[in-house]
Amino acid sequence: MNEGQVVQVIGPVVDVEFASDRLPDLYNAITIKTDKINITMEAMQHLGNNTVRCVALSSTDGLQRGMKAVDTGQPITVPVGRATLGRLFNVLGEPIDNQGPVETTERLPIHRPAPSFEEQQPSTEVLETGIKVVDLLAPYAKGGKIGLFGGAGVGKTVLIMELIRNIAYEHGGFSVFSGVGERTREGNDLYLEMKESGVLEKTALVFGQMNEPPGARLRVGLTGLTMAEYFRDAEGQDVLLFIDNIFRFVQAGSEVSALLGRMPSAVGYQPTLATEMGALQERITSTKKGSITSVQAIYVPADDLTDPAPATTFAHLDATTVLSRQIAELGIYPAVDPLDSTSRILDPRVLGEEHYQVARGVQQVLQRYKELQDIIAILGMDELSEEDKLIVARARKIQRFLSQPFHVAEAFTGQPGVYVPLKETIRGFKEILEGRHDNLPEQAFYMVGTIDEAVKKGQELM
């Protein structure tokens, strides 16, 4: 057993002295255990004089100089496999849901290399989500990374839960949710809502919330990722990985960097910002065995998209889903902005000509409606040309048809949720663009699944 001695404690940073020939490797887990204390730390720097600087992953209250610290000889390992589904973990992979120990012998280290060039599968397959606005206008690629933007109360959590539900029930896939530095109350709400809506048993949850020391918030993303990698590599699954919030990962890195005495770079962020982000993001990919598709909520500090944290994240994204308060105010949910959301695979070579043309057609009509709104506000609808009146009518139908009832919101809306297959989505919008449903009232298109439901609802209304 390789034992050292604590020589200095400054907040979450602890210096430990070892024998000269037995220095622990970087990233090794180092534990300090007494009757009252049980702390795991990670070796971060070799300082010289046989001293290792460590970052603690839990509170360092009660630590004293001279205490014994033990090098475990390996990085932090976390439980993986099906036993993790339906459970709630902390950064060390310890269950925190009072449901007893996890029934698994499989454990993996949280620091692992990204899949090599040969193992990667550059697939440009669409991941069908069953959510019309996403599948049509900003489709997700299997193994892609999606940024989810939205302020408070526009429906990020509900959208995340619906995605988890659809992947679980329609594709039989699993999800991993990593709560990084967000509010504990929100994590608790999510856990209880998932329990109620029945998606919990298909999901592993890992939390390192705002009250945790920066070391825990920096590593909790890797803990969730390691669990997701096991489902991809050992079980050949298409896994969904949610990270909420990727900005807090950067923020924790910046705190740790300052504590370790590194010179800050732009806007006070860590000099290793791009490296840390890359080490996490490069492990999220498609391999020949399976894929990890990741949806990352992105907080934009002071709405400044040029801030180094969001700017570094953008370099890794394949698609963005932007939730808009204006759309939520119209009562259209999911409140995805059809003109602001983007996708790298919105390309006829990937999606096929029909899907691409319909998507672009929908965007053109909505864009024209946006331009005409000022004229309508000042002069009224009557001043528009016949052609523009038709565009406005179709745009309003499209806008309403982009809404749909969610399974996970059934308890609140009283409406059964719908999963809309991609072909049905394309057919529906194509028919609206062609003017086949110009005679139906726009209310018929609100909160329905397929176009057939809209027609039926329209006939009942007329």
From Swiss-Prot:
SMART domains found in the cross-reference section: AAA (SM00382)
Residues noted as binding ATP in the record, renumbered to the chain: G150, G151, A152, G153, V154, G155, K156, T157
Class in the EC hierarchy, top level: translocase
Cellular compartments annotated: Cell membrane
Main subcellular location: membrane
Catalysed reactions listed for this entry: ATP + H2O + 4 H(+)(in) = ADP + phosphate + 5 H(+)(out)
Pfam families to which the protein is assigned, alphabetical: ATP-synt_ab, ATP-synt_ab_N, ATP-synt_VA_C
Membrane-topology annotation of the record: Peripheral membrane protein
Superkingdom of origin organism: Bacteria
SUPFAM superfamilies per record: C-terminal domain of alpha and beta subunits of F1 ATP synthase, N-terminal domain of alpha and beta subunits of F1 ATP synthase, P-loop containing nucleoside triphosphate hydrolases
Molecular functions (GO terms): ATP binding; ATP hydrolysis activity; proton-transporting ATP synthase activity, rotational mechanism
GO terms for cellular component: plasma membrane; proton-transporting ATP synthase complex
CDD domains referenced in this protein's UniProt entry, alphabetically: ATP-synt_F1_beta_C, ATP-synt_F1_beta_N, F1-ATPase_beta_CD
Keyword Cell cycle (UniProt): no
Alphabetical keyword list: ATP synthesis, ATP-binding, Cell membrane, CF(1), Hydrogen ion transport, Ion transport, Membrane, Nucleotide-binding, Translocase, Transport
InterPro entries from the UniProt entry: AAA+_ATPase (IPR003593), ATP-synt_VA_C (IPR055190), ATP_synth_F1_bsu (IPR005722), ATPase_a/bsu_AS (IPR020003), ATPase_alpha/beta_chains (IPR050053), ATPase_F1/V1/A1_a/bsu_N (IPR004100), ATPase_F1/V1/A1_a/bsu_N_sf (IPR036121), ATPase_F1/V1/A1_a/bsu_nucl-bd (IPR000194)
Listed EC numbers: 7.1.2.2
HAMAP family, A to Z: ATP_synth_beta_bact (MF_01347)
Similarity remark: Belongs to the ATPase alpha/beta chains family.
Role summary: Produces ATP from ADP in the presence of a proton gradient across the membrane. The catalytic sites are hosted primarily by the beta subunits.
Quaternary context: F-type ATPases have 2 components, CF(1) - the catalytic core - and CF(0) - the membrane proton channel. CF(1) has five subunits: alpha(3), beta(3), gamma(1), delta(1), epsilon(1). CF(0) has three main subunits: a(1), b(2) and c(9-12). The alpha and beta chains form an alternating ring which encloses part of the gamma chain. CF(1) is attached to CF(0) by a central stalk formed by the gamma and epsilon chains, while a peripheral stalk is formed by the delta and b chains.
Family annotation (PANTHER family): ATP SYNTHASE, ATP SYNTHASE SUBUNIT BETA, MITOCHONDRIAL
Protein name: ATP synthase subunit beta
Organism for this UniProt entry: Moorella thermoacetica (strain ATCC 39073 / JCM 9320)
